[in-house]
Amino acid sequence: MNHRKSKNKCVIAAASLLLPTLVHAQSGAASSVDPVSIASDTTEVMLPDQHINEVTITKRQTVRSMGGAINGQAMLKGELFKAACCNLGESFVNNPSVDVNYSDAATGAKQIKLLGLGGTYVQMLSELLPNFRGSAAPFALGYVPGSWMNSIQVSKGNASVKNGYEAMTGQINVQYLKPEDEQQVQFNLYGSSMGKFEANAMANLHINGNENCATELLTHFENNWNHHDGNGDGFQDDPQVRQYNIQNRWWARSGKYIFHGSIGALKEDRNTGQVKGHANPHGQPLYKIDIETNRYEASMKHAYVFENEQESSIALMGNVSMHQQKAGYGLKIYDVNEKNAYASLVFETNLGHEHNLSTGLSLNHDYLHQNVRLVHDAMLPTETMIESETVPGAYAQYTFNLHQRFVAMAGLRVDHSNVYGTFLTPRAHVKWVMNDVVTLRLSAGKGYRSPHVLAESNYVMASGRQLVIGKLGQEEAWNYGVSTAFMIPIADKTLKINAEYFYTHFLNQTIIDYDSDPKTITISDLDGSSYSHTFQVDASITPIKGLDLTAAYRYNLVRATYGGVLRAKPLQSRYKGLFTASYKPGLGLWQFDATFALNGGGRLPQSYTLADGSASWDNTYKAYPTLNVQVTREFRNFAVYAGGENLTGYKQKHPIIGCENPWSDSFDSTLVYGPISGAMVYAGIRAHF
């Protein structure tokens, strides 16, 4: 990171979107700065005087990283407030790169899709620490309340080797509200026409008015009590979810030493299935799904900045979590107690004005104790399955930065798994600012992932098909990317255009095969080819003051081998078109936001022939539109907002196959590609004091 100082101005030029959160303010004291604050190429901040403890940089819109070699963008709080944003999963409505889809029509499990591939290939980070692994993955997007988030950083393609070897298609990093920020109390209340209510309260305190020590309390409650069955198939469209979530965060500073720490706990009860009054054949009971979750986590960061010309720093970071889940799918059972521990030691130093070296050690441990029954037979005992993996590793990363015009970054990791042995992770990124208009980025690198298939995909138990799981190896893939950003001046405006292409090639992949046998779901290693081509172009402009417009188009070509046949990945839209408009006129008291998306058609798993000769379902689905709008009115200490989602009213027809007999092997709720519920309206209030 380069700092150029003048009398009343601090100019920060960022080398990467996801950087350690240590910079120097003009007074020379170390300050805590959200990484999103340094996402742009060069940002100028007017400082009121020489004695500065914090640097705060705010923008209302999404910021694309222009300074770093990694292709990424930061979604700031103003962007998150353009929609209801009840949780992390609802934060990407306006983002053309990230899709969030239901994994099945019964449990409400959602997954992120990036570069046309599922969320398990996207590394999830909280404050730059790996989080929400294994059994937390199916419902993790609902574990981060929207009101708690300060920003979200999304990087596509290969990430830095600093954060591990797992990111194959990108990273999503969540930055929470900061204890050291200005003291205030915040509230958020939300209610929807679907019977969902949320309440959030956040407060921070500077201990005894001390600018060197602060704490923060984040609380969240939600309750979705409605038994809504809009399509009349006898099943709830949305699960009943009651969640309690609390987190306590701490910050302290002494000279060149900085500490961040947090502890948190979550309790969630999720109930869904057939609604009362629905009769099953042969007097069978109602089919119900009940999932109880208790989660506990803690994290810490210790950092020290040395007083030398190299601006060297050392940091010790880590987090631990325990995720306990008891799930019943009819008479099937999946209970898991998962424990994870992660630690990282990082040293960074400048080797002159243009060279930077980062080295570090890491240790990750996953332990899963699972009790499983895969059939609807209460007389059968559960089977115990234990998965345990410990992975120590080391990395080195070199960055060459020539006046922010040319940045080259190369990194190498070596890790050793007690299950899969030793493996290497090379990654490289290049950024070249050709002129004031065009910026080119290139990336290439490898990623690995250890599959915990039932933990990560236990929603497949909501299918009546027989589940067959083979011996699974470590997933392994290469990813290559190229992107070009254009900053085109038009009169006194700037048209921003970004075009990018990414190619992901799997050497081994965990394949979930719905195609080979209509009565079976087979989970096995890849036997053949698997790849993803993704092309995206997006453009944004502010034609008049207060009006932001964005248009984007993305095309996905995703193929994998299922049962010896190379096929398009099922339930994956071939393309997506997106248009967003945000208008904040005059004094900024009103804000109007709208997002229109056209999701392209795709393939469903191979159907089978029913007794009457008809197909069990269509093998393809057509494109469908969605429209979201929101209006916000700002007041001195609060804001009122109201809006609607999926106002086009599109609903997937027959999202649950065989709903008339959920205890049979023809029942399947996992073939979901689009919205399950129709239009929804909501209203809420945000307050701060």
Residue ranges and their predicted role:
Residues 111, 129-156, 246:
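Short acidic/polar hinge/loop motifs at secondary-structure boundaries
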Residues 158-161, 171, 176-206, 236-239:
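Short strand-turn segments of transmembrane beta-barrel domains in outer membranes
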Residues 313-327, 433, 441, 473-531:
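Membrane-embedded beta-barrel scaffold of Gram-negative outer-membrane proteins
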Residues 36-40, 50-83, 111, 152:
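N-terminal periplasmic "start-of-domain" segments of outer-membrane beta-barrel proteins
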